[in-house]
Amino acid sequence: MLPSKKYLLIAIITLATLLLGFVFSGYLTLLLLGLDTKLFTWNTYYQYYHAIGQPQVAPFVGKIKWAGYLGFGLPLLVLLVTGLVLLLKKDKRSLHGDARFATGADLSKHGMFKKTGQSIVVGSHGGKLVRLDGQQFVILAAPTRSGKGVGVVIPNLLEYGESLVVLDIKQENFDLTSGWRASQGQEIYLFNPFAEDRRTHRWNPLSYVSDDPAFRVSDLMSIAAMLYPDGAEDQKFWVSQARNAFMAFTLYLFENWDDERSSGFPGGSGTPTLGAVYRLSSGDGSDLKKYLKALSERSFLSSNARSAFANMLSQADETFASILGTFKEPLNPWINPVLDKATSSNDFLLTDVRRKKMTIYIGIQPNKLAESRLIINLFFSQLINLNTKELPKSNPDLKYQCLLLMDEFTSIGKVEIIASAVSYMAGYNIRLLPIIQSMSQLDATYGREVSRTIITNHALQILYAPREQQDANDYSDMLGYTTVRKKNVTHAREKTHNFTEERRALMLPQELKAMGPDKEVFLYEGIPHPVKCDKIRYYKDRYFTSRLLPKVDVPMLNV
């Protein structure tokens, strides 16, 4: 029995005991006074107790009071014993489990109907929106065409009150929600580096490299690790050499820029960009090795730059060519002039997402997803890296939370920093809401152990009806088991009945697959029971449709 039910039962028994004591005291009064009990009524004791002050009743006051002591005392003693038994009695554990779905009262108790500026909308229960406040992460597992956009992505873009970065494949979310977010005082940016209409804001990942030579190398090493992630054991040499080549070319560009500024050279090459790195590494049409050797001998180069060039140029010609091939592979998209221009400067700063309210839409056409995979991965990697260096409690300017709403999370490949930083990101007020098609898809991208770590660090997990049988089996296990009593009837000489207890999944795999397009289940670590609720359909809810405003204008690149 639940504690709340125990206390309710005790309250009912207490009230009944007082009424019984009142009636019983009247009957005892007649007995102690030697009167005919046929005179007894439900309020007899009240009549005698009320007359205690009268002179003719004075000789009998003691008996009247004793009738009250006994009449109330005996039932109260029984109540006390009963109450202690109920309070001290241990719950009988069901043989196979006690899983059940949470109720609206459970959700209300945990504040999940409350709206704040940091609330993530996760579903609807009893006609009310269910939200998760605070810093905890949410993950949604939803197959394609299951309503994740209309049920989670757009509702949160139309309500979440602080900074937000969203992976917006097809750019539908920008078209529908940027107007409302702008009306709430947010700065709105669209980064679409492959925009066919050339409308995009700009982001230069190399602009975050320190001007201080003491920190520049480590900043460049961080970017190199994002562009050239660790691979299999047999790839270590090539990854290491590609990172070294990146260091050589980027240090050359930065130190050339330093030299131009210190000498007062008008115009100059400007802030280095990845497009400039690609062009520098492509040479001038002459013998590439001789060209790079000439670069390595420039007087302004630091010892770090010279060492990186020397390492690369010391390789045999065939090895050198393979190193350059590995190095240029992630940079080949920069032959596209739109991408080159979109990463040539900054219209927004990634370091501002916790300083002011802003929304960045990363808009990618589906046919460019493979081509843009690395640049999006780099974007999120750098965003997380830059915003997990200083805690909000150490800097009062970092007063806003930033939610990373990552639709098609696995489509951008393994974001290494998420795998390593997921356990401490929340402390920096960076919050995750990744959307995957299935748990097995996450396993395939991150590996089973890392994906389990990622899932474990998401306090709330939303599950839509799965399509794969293995996912249905896994979800059924996650929801737990309950005990059901089954009645058995046997017919022999006499008809007999007996009951057996059997284990049953709260939801069988086939029931999860048949959950339908309008229902969802979520598990939240703050509530011991899973929650079955309704999916949101923003277009059916005036609360959301009233916020659909014209989209924000985006400047056109001069390409």
Positions of PLM-derived features:
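Short gly/ser/thr-rich secondary-structure transition/capping motifs
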Residues: I120-H125, S344, A444-T445
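Short alpha-helix boundary/capping motifs
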Residues: I52-V57, R355, T453-I454, F499, ...
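Basic- and hydrophobic-enriched, low-structure N-terminal and domain-boundary segments
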Residues: M1-S146, V150-V153, P205, Y481, ...
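Conserved ATP-driven motor cores of ASCE-family P-loop NTPases powering translocation/secretion/packaging/pilus
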Residues: V422-Y424, Y428-V521
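Flexible domain-boundary/linker segments
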Residues: T41-W42, S263, S344, P396, ...
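P-loop NTPase motor domains
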Residues: L18-L30, G34, L88-L95, L129-I430, ...
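Short, flexible active-site loop motifs that bind/organize anionic cofactors or intermediates
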Residues: L15, E408, I462
